[in-house]
Each structure stands twice: as C-alpha cells, then as structure tokens.
Swiss-Prot record:
Family that this chain belongs to: Belongs to the pseudouridine synthase TruD family.
Top-level EC class as recorded in UniProt: isomerase
Active site: 87
MF GO annotations: RNA binding; tRNA pseudouridine(13) synthase activity
Source superkingdom: Archaea
Protein's name in the database: Probable tRNA pseudouridine synthase D
Keyword Hydrolase: no
Originating species: Methanococcoides burtonii (strain DSM 6242 / NBRC 107633 / OCM 468 / ACE-M)
A family per Pfam: TruD
Ranges in coiled-coil conformation: none
Lineage: Archaea, Methanobacteriati, Methanobacteriota, Stenosarchaea group, Methanomicrobia
Function (record text): Could be responsible for synthesis of pseudouridine from uracil-13 in transfer RNAs.
InterPro entries referenced in this protein's UniProt entry, alphabetically: PsdUridine_synth_cat_dom_sf (IPR020103), PsdUridine_synth_TruD (IPR001656), PsdUridine_synth_TruD_CS (IPR020119), PsdUridine_synth_TruD_insert (IPR011760), TruD_catalytic (IPR042214)
Keywords associated with the record: Isomerase, tRNA processing
Length: 439
C-alpha cells in the first residue's frame, strides 16, 4: 500500500491509481533535468507581417525574457506574441511572433542562455489559443534502487497507466502552492464571504515547510494584526503579502481592498484553486466508488473534441441508456471526454451515480454554491464549468547511471500532455514521494 503524502490530501488527492511501489528520486537537480517543448497547431509560411521564431530558453521566466528582448530591439512588448508561459527552472522551447520585424534586426540580440531560430512569417500573431499541449522530457535523479528493481517498477507503472487509459486529470500541487498550499483555503473563505479570514490566511497562515523565521513572523502577525511589524519582518520576496499589509496599515478594515493590491491573475487564482480542490476530491471519490475514468456511465456528462483536438467545454451532453454505447465509442476514440465539475453558482451536475458522487462531495465539504457570486470582488465570481477527468498519455522511460549521484540511477520520462494539465500528475504515479521533491 502506497501512502499518499499529507500535503496532497490537503489539496483533495488521497490516492494513487497505480499500485506499484514508487521509484523515489528527486527532480530538478539541475535546470537541464526539466525540458518542455511546446506543441501548437500552427504551420508557418514565408510571407506576412509577423516574424515567427522558435525560442529556446534556460532558467528564464517568459515575461522577463520578453521584456529584455524588446529592450534590445527597442520595440514595445505589445508587438511580441506567444502561446503560453513556460517553467522558469527548465529548458523550454516555444514559438514567439514579433510584429513588423526584419530578420536582420535579430543579429543584435545576445541574451544569456537563449537561442532564437527563425521559422518563417505569418499574418497571424502567436496567441494563447495556438497552444494545444506540451511535451515533457524530465529526468528523475538520485534513485536508490538496483537496475533490475527499477526497471520492474517502471514497466509495471507504465503498463498500469496504459491499461487505465491514462491518469486522473488532477490539479497538481503547483495550483495550490508547493511550499505553502494555501490558495484554495483563501478561495474557500472568499466564497464564504469571509474576506477578513481570507486575507489573514494569505498574509499570515504559516506552513511547516517554510523557513522558521518566516513561520515566526507570520504567526505574530496572525495573532496581533500588527502589519507594521509584519512589514519589518517579512522577507522582500513575499511581495504580495507585503502589498496587502501596506494597504491594511492605512485602511485596517479594508480586507477586500487589500486583495485589490494583487495582480488580477493572482486574485482569480484563489477561487480557481478552491474549485480545483473540490474537483480533485470528486475524482478521488469516483475512483474509490469503482466508477471508471476512461468510460462513461449513465448520468455522466461528456464534452466533445474541438478542431484543435482539445475538449470543448462549451459542448456538453448527458449520457443516457439510449446513447451510452455511442458515447463510449467516442470516448474510446478520444473524440469525447468524461467530465467532472469545477463548481460555480450555475454548475451543471451529473445525474445517476456520478451525480450522487458530485452532490455528496459538495455536501460533505459544505460548499456554498451561491457564494461563487462574490459581491465584494465581482471579478472573482464564477459560473462554473466542467473539465475532463482523464489525462490520456503514453509515457516512455530511459534508465541510465546518474553522473551527479555516484552509485545511483537516473530515469528520463518523456510524455505529452494537453494544455492546462500538470506533469506532476504523471510523475507522482512513478515517484510516489513528497511533492516538494517534485517541485
């Protein structure tokens, strides 16, 4: 029996779907151990007002690189398009577009740990919708098993994933915070309209994996609400907590206003994380009650494949006794996908046994459905939608001696996932370790 780490249980994940022992190991001992190659549905030509480039970067945050690139080219950042941001602590390859740019201008670009390759031209910029997925090439190091046992565990886990048709499409620990999984806790308080509790949780709730001095100053602020002391003691890298405390120094009761100091994408992350926690819990409950992920049952709601080959969450249909065979034929061919709810104030829930599971979880967690209309911060309101519950993937693995850790082995895993999915959902089934070792 493989014990799931407590931190994963806190985010709604309390099981593995593979029964094999984990291989252990560590990720990201060096930047090159984590590779991401963007998959798009674009084909570039030779004419057009946009220059299309392939950008390979090492240890760069995407927005920072675009900022530095546009400074060198002396152009506005608005002229650069890309389909998605990529991990910083990784070697990543993606397309970018630059409006009204000649190839010769790139001769002046010399940025550390980057490579730009001209692919062609287009009359269409790179946009978020162009991303269909990512290929991950990830090295797990410091594996303390003999080669025969390692091969056995890898082959059994891979066979199990193939037999299941993939792995659960969980929201990974990054959605919640690897060091401090707090975002869904904050989101729950927002949905319950306890904005003070939400603000204090984000600013001052401490977690055991944080540095001890950070835990201590958070605890003091939590007890005293002395934000001036907090600003003196909080490390500068905790810039979002510091921004909220700056606001509360001048307006001590304006907790909603303190959230307004955060970037819009960070504010939205809280309610999204709460929805993700409920969703993870529903998938685990479905598995424990013996319902499949790779096949629909009566009462399920499925969505259909769009032109890009991705789930179209706006096209849903309920599974009935009359259409179940046809639906499962589509599911088997990856043209339809079984879904679970990201709960909101206008959620469409399944019926039959899947619907019972969804309603049981919502009741057990005492989810206030109407609370997803957030009157104090309307932009955080969410109607809800449904998301596919299975990640179809076909991992490949390679075993080699680990040159960084004498007497140990390293395994390179190669797999592709659709956009919006988490590589850790695959890695956790192989490694079965604490999430911090995967971050």
């Amino acid at each position: 029996m493989n014990n799931v780490p407590n931190v994963e249980k806190q985010i709604g994940i309390d099981l593995y779907t593979t029964k094999t022992p984990g291989i252990g190991g560590k990720l990201r001992q060096q930047t090159e151990d984590f590779g991401v190659i963007e998959i798009t549905n674009r084909e570039e030509g030779t004419e057009g007002k946009y220059l299309i480039l392939e950008l390979t970067k090492r240890n760069w945050e995407t927005h920072h690189l675009i900022r530095d690139l546009t400074r060198i080219l002396r152009i506005s950042q608005k002229r650069v398009g890309f389909a998605g941001t990529k991990d910083k602590r990784a070697v990543t390859t993606q397309k970018i577009s630059i409006y009204d740019m000649e190839e010769e201008a790139l001769q002046n670009v010399h940025l550390k740990d980057t490579e730009l390759k001209i692919l062609g031209r287009s009359n269409k910029s790179l946009e978020l919708g162009d991303l269909t997925g990512n290929e991950f090439i990830i090295t797990v190091r410091d594996i303390d098993l003999d080669e025969k046992e390692l091969e056995s565990r890898l082959s059994q886990t891979t066979a199990s994933i193939k037999e299941q048709g993939g792995v659960p499409n969980f929201f990974g620990i990054q959605r919640f915070g690897a060091l401090r999984p707090i975002t869904h806790v904050v989101g729950e308080s927002i949905v319950r309209n306890d904005i003070e509790k939400a603000a204090m949780a984000y600013i001052a709730a401490s977690y055991p994996d944080e540095p001890e001095d950070t835990q201590e100053v958070r605890n003091r602020v939590f007890e005293t609400k002395d934000y001036i002391e907090g600003l003196k003691g909080y490390p500068l890298q905790l810039r979002y907590e510091r921004a909220m405390m700056h606001h509360l120094v001048s307006k001590p009761e304006d907790y909603a206003g303190s959230f307004e100091t955060l970037p819009a994408n960070i504010r939205k992350m809280f309610v999204h994380a709460y929805q993700s926690y409920i969703y993870n819990t529903i998938i685990c409950s479905r598995i424990k009650k013996g319902l499949p992920l790779n096949r629909a049952v009566v009462g399920d709601i499925v969505c259909f494949k769009n032109k890009a080959g991705l789930p179209d969450k706006s096209r849903n249909e309920r599974v009935t006794e009359d259409n179940i065979d046809g639906m499962n034929n589509l599911v088997k061919r990856n043209r339809a996908f079984v879904t679970a709810p990201l709960v909101g104030y206008s959620s469409e829930l399944a019926s039959g046994v899947p619907g019972e599971i969804e309603r049981e979880v919502i009741e057990e967690l005492n989810v206030p459905i109407e609370g997803f209309k957030v009157p104090s911060m309307e932009e955080l309101s969410s109607k809800g939608l449904r998301r596919e519950i299975l990640l179809s993937t076909d991992p490949k693995y390679f075993i080699e001696e680990d040159e960084l850790n004498e007497g140990k082995y390293r395994v390179t895993l190669d797999f592709s996932l659709p956009k919006g999915s988490y590589a850790t959902t695959i890695l956790r089934e192989y490694m079965k370790v604490e999430p911090l070792k995967m971050s």
